[in-house]
Amino acid sequence: MGMIKVIKMDLHGYHPSEIVQTDVLKKIIQQTWEMGENCVTLIHGHGRNRGISPGFVNTNTGYFGLEIRRALRHDKELRQWISYTTLDCSDMGVTRVKLKPNPAPTRSELDHDLLPEMKLGRRSW
């Protein structure tokens, strides 16, 4: 059996509008698959330091995590790379999904400019 290869992507400090509502999440998944990885772990935070908000009471994440999970479950374009039924939401602030096998990986690393530039200070979204 081959080694299980997992990419971990820390998305702390980003807003869903920068990752989920753009093509960044798609690029993360696609490039990870192109590397021949087996799984991608998206670290988005659990949103607990903001108190209990309506809609988050029975979840182990906040708004960002829910948006990521919604995209992974429902974006049909992502299904060419992921096994969406393998979505793992068991850890607080983290979402994992298994990738479909790639018999011929074409890249060795993620693009260095994959994530948008971090903005300092208050954002205007």
Specify the residue positions occupied by each region the protein language model found:
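Long, charged, low-complexity intrinsically disordered regions
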Residues: 1-125
